[in-house]
């Protein structure tokens, strides 16, 4: 059926900020969908609150609204734009839930707006646990014994009836939010209560656990003519019981017999047809490893995280096809863009193995609960492609950018047998390394299977790699063993370690004997049809399929997996760098390992290499492509860390030189530059021993800021207020050494700001200064920021501009850089300089209209700022005021302290823009899901040193009609100052009392918590327990008084003053 001509304008709802469970995959799918709709001639209106995405670029849709994803806000845009239809199935769970909420308000019926793609009834049937169970039973498809409940009492009664373990699955949530496995009555009571609160329809499915079954996923497409096809079958390494987003996943399935595959395939197609889904959908199934029995787990009636993985694993662009199906086209009339000759109805065939491994945030949160279950905890993922499961898995481990570079973990090596068995039985994010360690200690496949329930085939893959380690170690410099090792994915670094050599020695031996990788094409059809996809992976098997073109080429290094401190913002910069290179006539080549992102869409660059971002893999691509050079400024710390090694091997680093990159990051060299330019910076000392750090802190006087050098996202950075706290910090971060010094800085309390600048060596352009709303001490990634600045004088802005220019020229910056300042008493202090793109690039690019990554790329390639039409100094400021607000995922991570400090904790961001600061703040808070009633109850739990500062804030809350709740000390202080305060008892005072602080939170009496009790790092401290309870109960929480002040500004703007005349 040809595309529809009765609709002209389509609204696409984006997925909002990145949180655990909903990461960059929706930027990728949303971007694809918008471009596909525009290709077909439709006018596209996009609504999304996330400025960090390619999707919210003005080139992606005809109209782009970066506005809060709330019913009010989206309804206002609908009334302004009058779209003919809305496409909600590409914005993750947020997009789906928004469509359902809009339908309930009646606006869609009132304005005759149609929902494209899967119909509302189908979405409800798939998402509503009870309706879905009834459908499966009607179709004769098996589901685990289960019951939908709306109260904790019903959950407990059903638990007693069917026995434990039990899985709780809240309705209409994503990433397993609020769910979990319960082994007893108490666990079920707690998880069911939490799940009911987090479900938008207060409903949970309680089902008998089938943990231990194989978990299989099918990515399925269907059109309105009932053509349906399987894009990809994926098999989880981990059995059922661990959320698929936290599981290692292989594609194609590795252990299914043809009979099992056809049985599960038929079930998936039967489900998508019965649900009448139009577009892409993900079917999750559980297969008994010992029989042909299976159960249907769930269907996601939308494009999902797995769809992004399936698209990259097969080369089949699911979101693009889903968008075309939504406008009435059928699979037999849509061309497959990979082959250009076959149609979209052909099921992809794979002649390689893909392995996905999740990337977890526990390097940032060492005290978090790391046990994996049905609630997702990973922030991102990596994917690798090889000819064998071993090769794909090894390459995926190398892509993770964690301490472990292969299957050997020093921590696992030190563990006792008991500890290893514990780790195998209760899976954590690092279980793979403990599996390998168990095999090194002689555990049999049967022993390990008994402990883990992981399929024997996958265990054999891990065991084979451990056996290969022994063979490599026993045969140093043996060429046959080297060939075999490379075939199974062992890196030069690992082989060098086993041979007690340097990686360069292994590389030289390899190259001298012609043991070099070939690059194979990902073509969706296992080479059955002619294909010209510029999408490659390396292997040591077969012929090379990547041919060097005659054009001059430049390699852009991506930023790897999404993690805290290095998010989708860096992918945004990578993609824009590619665009600039293409406009200048270069062949733009991307190397990256992240399946969720736009940069790994093969249609974005001229050539895509899906490879680990290690020195070895990047050098191998350089050896083949012989580029003009490599750009490292846009891939975050990942690419910067590769610069020195690449240069050492003769690869040209374009833009700022390696020597100058080092001068910015090396503390002593940087101090010299600051001194020579007569600039201010907080006094700081460097120490390489425990005693040295203690002495430095005494010399500077507390509080001090302590951190390791060379870090991203403020990792292991803390403000320390006493000797005891410093001792604890050093105990937690014991790896101080000559080459790992600790920096100790005088902590300056002032206004912090961020500047992104572009320099060509003569001219320095400052697109804008972003003022942080929180005082110094909160990491810039966790601070709210406003542009243009609201409290800086012209004189201060001039000083900031002057210092930026001096530093850019002194550091010989060529390209982009980021500087952070503290402004105190009119003086400007330099905190740090990052000689690369920062996470504020997308935000600032969108509000100033200066495509910073593109401008910087042109500078890197030799085009001056003047030639591009830019003048020296600060760019003119727009009339609109824009606020960037961080978004956190604390509800997904138990035991992570939500107190904000110099270590970054946010996973995403939103933006609010308007003509006044208060309105921009209101939109930013709304986008970050911090919408408060016009009057309500605020709980204040405040450090003694903050008591004076809280007084004006408390008075302002009282003036707009808020009731104030506080514990004894704060309450007495506020009462003395003529404020009416409701007294609550402390956490450990009378735990049964109705007015105990935790019971007040549990009973839903509190609308907002302001808690500044942050410097006790213990998990049983009052401050920590109150914060945890606020997060569990979904109560907005602030830990910085500046944020409370900003929130008040937005609330006051909505309220009317009621002041007596007398």
UniProtKB/Swiss-Prot annotation:
Q: Where does Mg(2+) 1 bind?
A: 284, 298
- Residue positions annotated to bind Mn(2+) 2 are 298, 300
Which NCBIfam families would you find in this protein's record? CPSaseII_lrg, PRK05294.1, PRK12815.1
Quick one: which residues bind Mg(2+) 2? 298, 300
**So what family is this one in?**
Belongs to the CarB family.
| Metabolic or biological pathway | Amino-acid biosynthesis; L-arginine biosynthesis; carbamoyl phosphate from bicarbonate: step 1/1; Pyrimidine metabolism; UMP biosynthesis via de novo pathway; (S)-dihydroorotate from bicarbonate: step 1/3
Outline the segment boundaries, as ranges, of region: Carboxyphosphate synthetic domain.
Answer: 1-401
The organism's place on the tree of life at top rank: Bacteria
EC annotation?
6.3.4.16, 6.3.5.5
Q: Which residues bind Mn(2+) 3?
A: 820, 832
Where is the MGS-like domain positioned along the sequence? 930-1062
Q: How is the cofactor bound?
A: Binds 4 Mg(2+) or Mn(2+) ions per subunit.
Q: Which Pfam families match?
A: CPSase_L_D2, CPSase_L_D3, MGS
Q: Which reaction does it catalyse?
A: hydrogencarbonate + L-glutamine + 2 ATP + H2O = carbamoyl phosphate + L-glutamate + 2 ADP + phosphate + 2 H(+)
The residues that hold ATP 2 are 707, 746, 748, 752, 777-780, 820, 832
Gene Ontology annotations for the cellular component aspect, listed alphabetically:
cytoplasm
Q: What is this protein called?
A: Carbamoyl phosphate synthase large chain
């Amino acid at each position: 059926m040809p595309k529809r001509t009765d609709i002209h304008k389509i609204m696409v709802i984006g997925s909002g900020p990145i949180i655990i469970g909903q990461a960059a995959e929706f930027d990728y799918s949303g971007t694809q969908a918008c471009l596909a709709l525009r290709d077909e001639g439709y006018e596209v209106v996009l609504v999304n609150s996330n400025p960090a995405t390619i999707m919210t670029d003005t080139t992606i849709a005809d109209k782009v609204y970066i506005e809060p994803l709330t019913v009010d806000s989206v309804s206002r845009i609908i009334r302004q734009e009058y779209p003919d239809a809305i496409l909600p199935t590409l914005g993750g769970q947020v997009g789906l839930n928004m469509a359902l909420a809009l339908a309930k308000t009646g606006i869609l019926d009132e304005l005759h707006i149609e929902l494209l793609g899967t119909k509302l009834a189908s979405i409800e049937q798939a998402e509503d646990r009870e309706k879905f169970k009834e459908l499966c039973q009607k179709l004769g498809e098996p589901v685990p014994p289960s019951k939908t409940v709306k109260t904790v009492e019903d959950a407990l009664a059903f638990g007693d009836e069917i026995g434990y373990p039990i899985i709780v699955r809240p309705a209409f949530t994503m990433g397993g939010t609020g769910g979990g496995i319960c082994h007893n009555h108490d666990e079920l009571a707690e998880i069911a209560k939490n799940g009911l609160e987090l479900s938008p329809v207060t409903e949970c499915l309680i089902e008998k656990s089938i943990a231990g079954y194989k978990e299989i996923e099918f990515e399925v497409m269907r059109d309105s003519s009932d053509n349906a096809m399987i894009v990809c079958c994926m098999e989880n390494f981990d059995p059922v019981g661990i959320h698929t987003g936290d599981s290692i996943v292989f594609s194609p399935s590795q252990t299914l017999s043809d009979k099992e595959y056809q049985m599960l395939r038929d079930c998936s197609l039967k489900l998508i047809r019965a649900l009448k889904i139009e577009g892409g959908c993900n079917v999750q199934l559980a297969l008994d490893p010992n029989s042909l029995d299976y159960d249907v787990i769930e269907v996601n009636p939308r494009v999902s995280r797995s769809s992004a993985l399936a698209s990259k694993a097969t080369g089949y662009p699911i979101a693009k096809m889903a968008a075309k199906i939504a406008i009435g086209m059928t699979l037999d009339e849509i061309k497959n863009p990979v082959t250009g000759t076959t149609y979209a109805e052909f099921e992809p065939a794979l002649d390689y193995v893909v392995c996905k491994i999740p990337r977890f945030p526990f390097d940032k949160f060492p005290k978090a609960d790391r046990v994996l279950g049905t609630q997702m905890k990973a922030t991102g993922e990596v994917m690798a492609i090889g000819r064998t499961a071993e090769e794909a898995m090894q390459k995926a481990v190398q892509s993770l950018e964690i301490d472990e570079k292969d299957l050997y973990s020093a921590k696992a090596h030190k563990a006792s047998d008991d500890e290893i068995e514990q780790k195998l039985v209760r899976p954590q994010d690092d279980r793979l390394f403990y599996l390998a360690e168990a095999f090194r200690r002689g555990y049999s496949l049967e022993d390990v299977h008994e402990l883990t329930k992981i399929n024997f085939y996958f265990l054999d893959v891990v065991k084979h790699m451990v056996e290969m380690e022994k063979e490599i170690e026993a045969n140093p410099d043996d060429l046959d063993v080297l060939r075999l090792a490379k075939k199974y994915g062992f890196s030069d670094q690992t082989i060098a370690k086993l041979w007690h050599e340097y990686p360069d020695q292994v590389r030289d031996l390899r190259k001298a004997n012609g043991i070099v990788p070939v690059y194979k094409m990902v073509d969706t059809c296992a080479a059955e049809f002619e294909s010209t996809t510029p999408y490659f992976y390396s292997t040591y098997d077969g012929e090379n399929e990547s041919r060097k073109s005659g054009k001059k080429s430049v390699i852009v290094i991506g930023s790897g997996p999404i993690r805290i401190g290095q998010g989708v913002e860096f992918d945004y910069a990578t993609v824009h760098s590619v665009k600039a290179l293409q406009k200048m006539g270069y062949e733009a080549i991307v190397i990256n390992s992240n399946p969720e992102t736009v940069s790994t869409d093969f249609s974005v660059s001229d050539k895509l290499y899906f490879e680990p971002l290690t020195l070895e893999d990047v050098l191998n691509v350089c050896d083949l492509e012989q580029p003009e050079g490599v750009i490292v400024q846009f891939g975050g710390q990942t690419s910067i860390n590769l610069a020195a090694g690449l240069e050492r091997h003769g690869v040209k680093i374009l833009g700022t030189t390696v020597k100058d990159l080092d001068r910015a990051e090396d503390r002593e060299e940087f101090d010299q530059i600051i001194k020579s330019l007569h600039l201010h910076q907080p006094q700081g000392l460097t120490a390489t021993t425990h005693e040295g750090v203690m002495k430095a802190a005494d010399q500077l006087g507390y509080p001090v800021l302590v951190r390791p050098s060379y870090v991203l996202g403020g990792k292991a950075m803390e403000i320390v207020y006493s000797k005891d706290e410093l001792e604890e910090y050093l105990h937690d971060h014991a790896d101080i050494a000559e080459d790992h010094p600790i920096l100790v800085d005088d902590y300056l309390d002032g206004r912090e700001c961020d500047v992104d600048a572009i320099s060509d060596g003569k001219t320095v352009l400052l697109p804008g200064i972003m003022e942080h709303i929180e005082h110094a001490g909160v990491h810039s990634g966790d601070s709210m920021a406003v542009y243009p600045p609201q409290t800086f004088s012209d004189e201060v802005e001039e000083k900031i501009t002057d210092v930026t220019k001096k530093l850019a020229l002194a550091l010989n910056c060529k390209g982009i850089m980021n500087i952070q300042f503290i402004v105190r008493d009119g003086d400007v202090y330099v905190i740090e300089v990052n000689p690369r793109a920062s996470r504020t690039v997308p935000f600032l690019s969108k509000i100033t209209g200066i495509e910073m990554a593109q401008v910087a790329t042109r500078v890197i390639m030799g085009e001056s700022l003047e030639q591009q039409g830019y003048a020296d100094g600060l760019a003119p400021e727009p009339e609109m005021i824009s606020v960037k607000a961080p978004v956190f995922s604390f509800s997904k991570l138990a035991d992570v302290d939500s107190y904000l400090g110099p270590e970054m904790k946010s996973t995403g961001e939103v933006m609010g823009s308007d003509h006044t600061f208060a309105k921009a703040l209101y939109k930013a808070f709304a986008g970050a899901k911090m919408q408060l009633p016009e009057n309500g109850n605020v709980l204040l739990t405040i450090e003694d040193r903050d008591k004076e500062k809280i007084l004006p804030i408390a008075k302002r809350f009282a003036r707009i009609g808020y009731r104030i709740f506080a514990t004894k000390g704060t309450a007495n202080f506020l009462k003395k100052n003529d404020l009416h305060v409701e007294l609550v008892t402390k956490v450990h005072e009378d735990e049964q009392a109705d007015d105990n602080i935790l019971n007040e939170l549990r009973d839903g009496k509190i609308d907002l918590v302001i808690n500044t009790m942050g410097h006790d790092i213990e998990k049983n401290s009052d401050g920590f327990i109150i914060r945890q309870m606020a997060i569990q109960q979904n109560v907005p929480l602030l830990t910085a008084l500046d944020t409370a002040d900003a929130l008040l500004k937005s609330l006051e703007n909505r309220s009317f003053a009621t002041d007596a005349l007398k």
